[in-house]
UniProtKB/Swiss-Prot annotation:
It comes from Pyrococcus abyssi (strain GE5 / Orsay). [4Fe-4S] cluster 1 binds at residues 53, 56, 59, 93. It comes from the Archaea. Pfam families: Fer4_21. Its cofactor is [4Fe-4S] cluster. This is Pyruvate synthase subunit PorD. Binds 2 [4Fe-4S] clusters. One of its GO terms (molecular function) is oxidoreductase activity, acting on the aldehyde or oxo group of donors, iron-sulfur protein as acceptor. [4Fe-4S] cluster 2 binds at residues 63, 83, 86, 89. Keywords: 4Fe-4S, Electron transport, Iron, Iron-sulfur, Metal-binding, Repeat, Transport.
Length: 105
């Protein structure tokens, strides 16, 4: 069987594509949300009420971003550079110490 006259062209095109294109679903820098601030597009932001907080850490545990850390007393602190306003923290809070309020810019 004769070799296709287009084989060299196809191989060259495949090589160029694999060198130039990023395949989907591959994270070249896993965990890059720490590098790239992700909080600029939220519509709602968490507002914290310290007097209602029992320091259960559920907001910290369930936050899908690195947007909540705990201060030296164990109270949550929100990093609005990374908070996307998803509301999971407010939903998980058993004492309603976190309320989602409309973002004002």
């Amino acid at each position: 069987m004769a070799e296709s006259p287009f084989k060299a062209d196809i191989e060259r095109a495949q090589k160029e594509l694999t060198e130039k294109m990023t395949p989907g679903a591959i994270a070249y820098i896993p965990g890059s949300s720490v590098i790239n601030k992700t909080g600029s597009w939220r519509v709602f932001r968490p507002e914290f009420k310290k007097d209602k907080c029992v320091r259960c850490f559920l907001c910290y545990i369930y936050c899908p971003e690195p947007a909540i850390y705990l201060d030296e007393e164990g109270y949550p602190v929100f990093d609005y550079d990374y908070c996307k306003g998803c509301g999971i923290c407010a939903n998980e809070c058993p004492t309603n110490a976190i309320e989602m309020v409309r973002e004002v810019k």
